[in-house]
Amino acid sequence: MTPYEDKTLKDSLQEEKNKLKNMSLKDRLWYIWEYYKIPIIGTVVAVFLIFSIFSAVHNNRFETALSCVILNSQPDSEKDLVSEYFDQGFRQYLGLTDETKIDVDHSMSISFDNSNMTEFTYAELAKLSALISSKELDVMIARKDSIDHFGEMGGFLDLKEVLPPDVFDQVKDQLYEVTNSETGETIACGIKIGNTDFLKKTGLTMNDPILGIISNSTRTDTAVKLIRYVYGL
């Protein structure tokens, strides 16, 4: 690099530094996000993928029975009741061995309102998209807006076709339908679970939770068993 080029680079860096220095915190965050959001998102996705690879290598001796995300929920108890519900209660219900795990992430918070999108929101959406595209996710429990968003893109299985007759007959009035924006087909993308004891037993607070099975899930049988478990069937 020539001295001129080196000086130009230093000048550019100093100019950026001065711009940020003279901005308010709000304007500074907006500027960084507006001009650097692509590398920021790329870095987040790369870190998540690297973490997933290391996690897969570390846990390759374990078999995953089910992977579930619970979106936009708030714990109302200091005790980890979610782990008790899934890793103890549901595990016992399935009769799993110690070599089989249940993955549940209830930390994600996402929004589809463009006016409220932040770098954190983009990062969470990128993480969720990576889970779905890699076929690692089986079940999503979320509010109506999230189920609508992914359901309109064909993100869920039709529960009318997946549920066994004995289960369908008992929960058919709780099915939640969404119309695919491309095909125009309306299917039962999820099942309402707000009328069960799910929120009470998990210690979570969320509005009208709906459970959907991801369309490319590789463990649909276990996902259906989760519906049985939630409804006490």
Region locations from a protein language model:
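A bilobed periplasmic-binding-protein/Venus flytrap-type ligand-binding module shared by bacterial periplasmic
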Residues: 206-218
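Short, membrane-interfacial amphipathic segments enriched in basic
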Residues: 14-26
